[in-house]
Amino acid sequence: MFGLGGQPQLSSQQKLSAAEAELDLVTDMFNKLVDNCHKKCIEQIYNDGQLNKNESTCIDRCVAKYFETNVKVGENMQQLGQAFSPGKF
């Protein structure tokens, strides 16, 4: 408030740019998840148009591990960011 000690207010353009960057990151993460889990869990030669039980289970586990890893990496990055933030030196 009044520029004293608070977060600076972002302009509409800055908010839009931040939202676009976040959308790009989420889209990239989704595409990597699909690509990695597809390569790991689904044979290159399809015998059936539907996923079989093994493929479905593999994909479920792959996606769960991918998100769990993403959360852990995010938490570690946040801790590192706080440790090296200005005023900590």
From Swiss-Prot:
GO terms for biological process: protein insertion into mitochondrial inner membrane. This is Mitochondrial import inner membrane translocase subunit TIM10. Heterohexamer; composed of 3 copies of TIM9 and 3 copies of TIM10, named soluble 70 kDa complex. Associates directly with the TIM22 complex, whose core is composed of TIM22 and TIM54. Interacts with the transmembrane regions of multi-pass transmembrane proteins in transit. It is a peripheral membrane protein. Disulfide bonds join C37-C62, C41-C58. It comes from Kluyveromyces lactis (strain ATCC 8585 / CBS 2359 / DSM 70799 / NBRC 1267 / NRRL Y-1140 / WM37) (Yeast). Mitochondrial intermembrane chaperone that participates in the import and insertion of multi-pass transmembrane proteins into the mitochondrial inner membrane. Also required for the transfer of beta-barrel precursors from the TOM complex to the sorting and assembly machinery (SAM complex) of the outer membrane. Acts as a chaperone-like protein that protects the hydrophobic precursors from aggregation and guide them through the mitochondrial intermembrane space. It comes from the Eukaryota. It is found in: Mitochondrion inner membrane. Pfam families: zf-Tim10_DDP. The lineage of its organism: Eukaryota, Fungi, Dikarya, Ascomycota, Saccharomycotina. GO terms for cellular component: mitochondrial inner membrane. Keywords: Chaperone, Disulfide bond, Membrane, Metal-binding, Mitochondrion, Mitochondrion inner membrane, Protein transport, Translocation, Transport, Zinc.
